[in-house]
Curated annotation (Swiss-Prot):
Gene (name only): lipB
Pathway: Protein modification; protein lipoylation via endogenous pathway; protein N(6)-(lipoyl)lysine from octanoyl-[acyl-carrier-protein]: step 1/2
Domain BPL/LPL catalytic: 56-241
InterPro entries recorded: aa-tRNA-synth_II/BPL/LPL (IPR045864), BPL_LPL_catalytic (IPR004143), Octanoyltransferase (IPR000544), Octanoyltransferase_CS (IPR020605)
Record family assignment: Belongs to the LipB family.
HAMAP family found in the cross-reference section: LipB
Name the record gives this protein: Octanoyltransferase
Length: 251
């Protein structure tokens, strides 16, 4: 599948869909913004404001960010899934679907601000394409992963950590447009996941690429993920923010 070249500029439920490569999707460009390390509330407020201000001509965007430690609880989430009340990690209640999850250093978070009507995408199709992008990203590092029916996200396919969750997904659709997105664990302190039932599942093991013996660079994985998201969403793209915003340490 061909994708338009990426340019660098500066600046801070049915399953049917248009066939991949259709003109309708190529006419919907994507802007990729590398936001660096950013407080969760800042990103949350920004994507809500972006969505509220959208017009029919607003280009779609993907935001790549890393958050300081934070738990987020979906709009229908059960607070009982936070098992340790005094963990020292803040909890933010948000308007996405799903239960509780954790974001922290060493994790890639990708927010997808898309006009689904313009892309002729149904929500279930969008979820499938996001999951496929993550599966393809992990495959690039020789990691086999799978979906689970009724449990959005991506899971290790087999081995000692078979069934463990390595990526989470949660979206909000407002006026036909999506925000929130996915998180992919690269090299994290995984202990905060022990204080929750991840995504509402008691005892669910959470892993990162490092615990699967893949010494991957955060930047490299982020670039691979962006490429696979663009390919699966089939949009022309322009990457935003200065290249130095991509600098990241896995230490």
């Amino acid at each position: 599948m061909s994708v338009s070249p990426v340019a660098i500029v500066s600046t801070p439920v049915a399953v049917s869909a248009s066939p991949a490569g259709s003109p309708a999707q190529h006419d919907a460009p994507l802007t990729v913004r590398w936001r660096g390390t950013e407080a969760y509330q800042t990103s949350f407020d920004a994507m809500r404001a972006f969505t509220d201000a959208r017009t029919a001509e607003t280009p779609d965007e993907i935001w790549i960010v890393e958050h300081p430690p934070v738990y987020t609880l979906g709009q229908a989430g059960d607070p009982a899934h936070l098992l340790v009340a005094d963990s020292g990690v803040p909890l933010v209640k948000v308007d996405r679907g799903g239960q509780i999850t954790y974001h922290g250093p060493g994790q890639i978070v990708a927010y997808l601000l898309l006009d689904l009507r313009r892309r002729k995408l149904m929500v279930r199709t969008l979820v499938t394409r996001i999951e496929e992008a993550v599966i393809e990203t992990l495959a690039a590092y020789n990691l086999a992963s799978v979906r689970k029916a009724g449990a959005p996200g991506i899971y290790v396919a087999s081995g000692v950590h078979g069934g463990a969750k390595i990526a989470a997904l949660g979206l909000k659709i407002r006026n036909g447009c999506s925000y929130h997105g996915l998180s992919l664990n690269v090299k994290m302190d995984l202990r905060p996941f022990l204080a929750i039932n991840p995504c509402g599942y008691a005892g669910l093991e959470t892993v990162d690429m490092a615990s699967l013996e893949v010494a991957a660079d955060w930047n490299d994985v982020a670039r691979t993920l962006v490429g696979r998201l663009i390919a699966n969403l089939d949009g022309a793209s322009a990457a935003a923010d200065k290249p130095h915003a991509l600098e990241h340490s896995n230490d």
